[in-house]
Amino acid sequence: YEEGVMADFKLTEEDINFLCSHALVVTGIWGTIESELHRIKERNVPVAFDFADKINHEITHRALPYVDYAFFSCDNKSDKELHKFMISIKSKGPKVVIVTKGEKGSIVYDGNEFTEFGIVECEVIDSMGAGDSYIAGFLMGILEGKPIFECMQKGALSSSETIGYYGAW
């Protein structure tokens, strides 16, 4: 992946102020702001980060200490492998680790327990944007103060709506 014009992108103080005026900052592996996350965390603004499937990427390791909600996509590991991975990620800083598993649903680890949720059955037209929609629904639940299971349910519902039509991205 080549960043193009984003390779030289840097947040200004005005950008940081704008981001921190919101209830939550959401970014991802391609957002190129991982070196600035500490400035957001210093202001006690929660950070959600979409690491996609980049489990061992250098950005992943740099960002984790400043992330509250760490999202990963992984549908090729056993439950035992996922649990081990999620415990390891949680130990690096995030408050909650969320893994979407495609048609196998999702799993969340909050440091105390693993919570699993399946999918919302629907007709799949185009899976593009399913993960982003899950993240949006999950985080909406967080902002509404919902328990983890309900956040997962909101994420799955949002995802099911997105994959029901072509060109969601």
Predicted regions and their residues:
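Ribokinase/PfkB-type carbohydrate-kinase core domain
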Residues: 1-115
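Conserved phosphate-binding/catalytic region of the ribokinase-like
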Residues: 83-169
